[in-house]
Amino acid sequence: MASELINRRHETDQPTADAYYPKPIKPWFTVTRPMRYMLREQRLIFVLVGIAIATLVFTIFPRSTQSTPYSDPFSGYGIRPDESYVPAIQAQRKPSLEYLNRIGATGGKIPLGLKRKGLRVVVTGGAGFVGSHLVDRLMARGDTVIVVDNFFTGRKENVMHHFSNPNFEMIRHDVVEPILLEVDQIYHLACPASPVHYKFNPVKTIKTNVVGTLNMLGLAKRVGARFLLTSTSEVYGDPLQHPQVETYWGNVNPIGVRSCYDEGKRTAETLTMDYHRGANVEVRIARIFNTYGPRMCIDDGRVVSNFVAQALRKEPLTVYGDGKQTRSFQFVSDLVEGLMRLMEGEHVGPFNLGNPGEFTMLELAKVVQETIDPNANIEFRPNTEDDPHKRKPDITKAKELLGWEPKVSLRQGLPLMVKDFRQRVFGDQKEGSSAAATTTKTTSA
C-alpha cells in the first residue's frame, strides 16, 4: 500500500506535454533581431540610399527665409527706395503664441528646403483703391488672397494683374449676405468711403457697415480667423479736440447727410469690440485718415482726387467754403504698411493711421497747382453740410506700439498719383474721341 502511494506520487510529478515552462531569457535578443531583419533582403542598402538622397536634396536647395522677397508695386511709378515704404516685417512685433499655433506657424528657423507657410487671407473690398494695394502686398509676401467685392466702387482693373496667379481668387459678392470661407485673416475694407458714393445710397452704406461687419465677424468666429476692421477718422465727426487721439469719443451729428457713414463705422467698432469681449474673437481696429494715391476713383468727390482731375482737365479747382478747413493726407503705401503691422501685431487698438502733416484746402490746391498746372484757377463754392473744420491724427500710439509712421510726404506722393490719373484721364478721353470719330464716319456713310 505504501509503495503504491509512492509510485502514484512519482507519476504525478512527471511533466506533461501541455505544461508551460518559460523560455530562458536571451539578453541580446532585442538587439540581434532588428539587425537580422535589416541585413536580410538588402534592406540596409535601401535605407542608406534613402538617407543619401535626402541629404543631397536638402544640401542642394538653399534654406528659405521666413518671408518671401518683397517687390515694390510702386516701382513703375518711379519711387526710389528711400522715398517709398519698405516692408518691415522683421521689425514688427511678434504675433501672440496662441495665434501662431492656430495658423500652424512654428517658432525657430524654417528647416532646409522648406518655405514660409503662406496664410489664407480674405480682403473685402479688395478691388477698391486701398484694398487692391493691400492685395499687392499680401501676394508679394506669398499669401493666398481671396478678394470679396461687389464692384460698387471697386474695379477689376485694379487686380487684373493677379488673375493668372493660382494663389489669387476673386469672388463677386456683397458682404451684406453671409459667406463661408476657410481663412486665417480677414481684412474688412468693404464700404463706400467717398461722399459721392455713400450719399448716393445712404441705406446701403449703413447696411454694409453694420450687417456686413456682422457677417465678417461671424465668419471670423466660426473659422477662428483674426479680424481687422478699417474704421475711419470720421468717427471723430467735427472734432472739438485737436489733434485727435484714440481716446477722444468724437462730436458726430447722428442725423446728418454724412451720418450713414460716420455712425455706421462707429457701430462697426462697437460690434467688433463686442465680439472680442464676448466671443474671444481676435480683432484689430484701424482709424484711417485721408488717403491718396494711384487707383483712386477719379470722380469720387474726395478733395485730392477732385483737385488732380480738375487740374488735368484744365478746369478750375473747386474749394468749398473759405478753404481754411484742414486735412491730413497719407500716401496709400504708408497706410497699407500700417494695416499689415496692426494685423500682425499684438494690440487690438483702435489705432490712428494717418499722416500728421496738416494742410488747409487752399494749401492743398496750391500744391496741386505747383505739381500740374501753375496757371490753374481756384473757384470758391458754398461749403457742404456737416463738413468737419479740422482733422489731424495723433499717431503716438501707432509709433510706440506698432513702430509705424508715414514715410511719403505729400509733395513726394502727389506726382505718383498724378501720373496714374494722367494715364486714365487722357486714356478715357482718347477712347471717347475715337468712339465719337467712328460714330461720325458711320453716320456720314
Swiss-Prot record:
<dbReference type="GO" id="GO:0032580">
    <property type="term" value="C:Golgi cisterna membrane"/>
</dbReference>
<dbReference type="InterPro" id="IPR036291">
    <property type="entry name" value="NAD(P)-bd_dom_sf"/>
</dbReference>
<dbReference type="GO" id="GO:0000138">
    <property type="term" value="C:Golgi trans cisterna"/>
</dbReference>
<dbReference type="InterPro" id="IPR016040">
    <property type="entry name" value="NAD(P)-bd_dom"/>
</dbReference>
<dbReference type="GO" id="GO:0000139">
    <property type="term" value="C:Golgi membrane"/>
</dbReference>
<feature type="binding site">
    <location>
        <begin position="387"/>
        <end position="391"/>
    </location>
    <ligand>
        <name>substrate</name>
    </ligand>
</feature>
<feature type="topological domain" description="Cytoplasmic">
    <location>
        <begin position="2"/>
        <end position="43"/>
    </location>
</feature>
<feature type="modified residue" description="N-acetylalanine">
    <location>
        <position position="2"/>
    </location>
</feature>
<feature type="binding site">
    <location>
        <position position="302"/>
    </location>
    <ligand>
        <name>NAD(+)</name>
    </ligand>
</feature>
<comment type="function">
    <text>Catalyzes the NAD-dependent decarboxylation of UDP-glucuronic acid to UDP-xylose. Necessary for the biosynthesis of the core tetrasaccharide in glycosaminoglycan biosynthesis.</text>
</comment>
<feature type="binding site">
    <location>
        <position position="258"/>
    </location>
    <ligand>
        <name>substrate</name>
    </ligand>
</feature>
<keyword id="KW-0472">Membrane</keyword>
<dbReference type="InterPro" id="IPR044516">
    <property type="entry name" value="UXS-like"/>
</dbReference>
<dbReference type="GO" id="GO:0005768">
    <property type="term" value="C:endosome"/>
</dbReference>
<dbReference type="GO" id="GO:0070403">
    <property type="term" value="F:NAD+ binding"/>
</dbReference>
<keyword id="KW-0456">Lyase</keyword>
<feature type="binding site">
    <location>
        <position position="290"/>
    </location>
    <ligand>
        <name>substrate</name>
    </ligand>
</feature>
<keyword id="KW-0735">Signal-anchor</keyword>
<feature type="binding site">
    <location>
        <begin position="320"/>
        <end position="327"/>
    </location>
    <ligand>
        <name>substrate</name>
    </ligand>
</feature>
<comment type="similarity">
    <text>Belongs to the NAD(P)-dependent epimerase/dehydratase family. UDP-glucuronic acid decarboxylase subfamily.</text>
</comment>
<keyword id="KW-1133">Transmembrane helix</keyword>
<dbReference type="GO" id="GO:0005802">
    <property type="term" value="C:trans-Golgi network"/>
</dbReference>
<feature type="binding site">
    <location>
        <begin position="149"/>
        <end position="174"/>
    </location>
    <ligand>
        <name>NAD(+)</name>
    </ligand>
</feature>
<keyword id="KW-0210">Decarboxylase</keyword>
<keyword id="KW-0812">Transmembrane</keyword>
<feature type="topological domain" description="Lumenal">
    <location>
        <begin position="65"/>
        <end position="445"/>
    </location>
</feature>
<dbReference type="GO" id="GO:0033320">
    <property type="term" value="P:UDP-D-xylose biosynthetic process"/>
</dbReference>
<feature type="binding site">
    <location>
        <begin position="261"/>
        <end position="265"/>
    </location>
    <ligand>
        <name>NAD(+)</name>
    </ligand>
</feature>
<feature type="transmembrane region" description="Helical; Signal-anchor for type II membrane protein">
    <location>
        <begin position="44"/>
        <end position="64"/>
    </location>
</feature>
<keyword id="KW-0520">NAD</keyword>
<feature type="active site" description="Proton acceptor">
    <location>
        <position position="261"/>
    </location>
</feature>
<feature type="binding site">
    <location>
        <begin position="303"/>
        <end position="307"/>
    </location>
    <ligand>
        <name>substrate</name>
    </ligand>
</feature>
<dbReference type="GO" id="GO:0005794">
    <property type="term" value="C:Golgi apparatus"/>
</dbReference>
<dbReference type="Pfam" id="PF16363">
    <property type="entry name" value="GDP_Man_Dehyd"/>
</dbReference>
<comment type="pathway">
    <text>Nucleotide-sugar biosynthesis; UDP-alpha-D-xylose biosynthesis; UDP-alpha-D-xylose from UDP-alpha-D-glucuronate: step 1/1.</text>
</comment>
<keyword id="KW-0333">Golgi apparatus</keyword>
<protein>
    <recommendedName>
        <fullName>UDP-glucuronic acid decarboxylase 2</fullName>
        <ecNumber>4.1.1.35</ecNumber>
    </recommendedName>
</protein>
<dbReference type="GO" id="GO:0008460">
    <property type="term" value="F:dTDP-glucose 4,6-dehydratase activity"/>
</dbReference>
<comment type="subunit">
    <text>Homodimer.</text>
</comment>
<keyword id="KW-0007">Acetylation</keyword>
<dbReference type="GO" id="GO:0048040">
    <property type="term" value="F:UDP-glucuronate decarboxylase activity"/>
</dbReference>
<dbReference type="GO" id="GO:0016020">
    <property type="term" value="C:membrane"/>
</dbReference>
